[in-house]
A protein has these predicted regions:
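Residues forming the flavin
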Residues: 1-199
Length: 199
């Protein structure tokens, strides 16, 4: 098409858009804030659920199609939208994801050893905190862990804690087990791994 498109973010939405655009003849550059591509597929979903090699294969396939990736590039800091247009981009697709935690506004949520799932999973999945001190990204490896929530992210966090040595891991959810929004398979796996559920 001869058109240049900037894709901001390399998570599921960003790489899907980049692939479709490349297949249709667009010149695509993906700007990613992290040092690797994949977004939540890499930093949020644990290796035991989605191997990083699968995501890398997808990114490599996009590069083979001509998609360019600019890592460690925070749009807004390294360039504004206006500056990207000045650099010759005809369009910008914003796929920045939802990486911010949802605060509960309850007493104690800012205490030491209280982590939001996205920070905890990012430390383990992307920054190799599970290999401390080999990698200098520590995270607590508690023997007793409580995860509040009933979605897939909560299941990922509690199952990761079990793999990091938690002897007693609990999922605490405000409604009934049947009302948990997680996939039934995720709940089944968590229970099979010894996670206790407190609805």
């Amino acid at each position: 098409s001869g058109k240049k498109v900037a894709v901001v973010g390399s998570g599921p939405s960003g790489i899907t858009c980049a692939g479709e655009l490349a297949r249709n003849g667009f010149d695509v550059t993906v700007f990613e804030a992290f040092f690797t591509g994949g977004g939540v597929l890499v930093y949020g979903i644990p290796e035991f659920r989605l191997p990083k090699a699968v995501v890398k294969r997808e990114i490599d396939g996009l590069e083979d199609m001509g998609v360019k990736f600019e890592y460690n590039s925070v749009v807004g800091n390294m360039a504004t939208a206006e500056e990207l247009f000045e650099q010759g981009f005809d369009a910008i697709y914003v796929a920045t994801g939802a990486g911010l935690p949802k605060f509960l506004n309850v007493p104690g949520e800012n205490l030491p050893n209280v982590f939001f799932a996205n920070e905890y999973l990012t430390r383990v999945n992307l920054m190799k905190a599970n290999k401390f001190p080999e990698y200098d990204t520590p995270t607590k490896h508690g023997k007793n862990v409580v995860v509040f929530g009933g979605g897939n992210v909560a299941m990922d966090a509690v199952r990761t804690a079990k793999r990091l040595g938690a002897e007693h891991a609990i999922i605490a959810y405000r409604r009934t087990e049947d009302e948990m929004p997680c996939r039934r398979a995720e709940l089944h796996h968590a229970k099979a791994e010894g996670v206790e559920v407190l609805p």
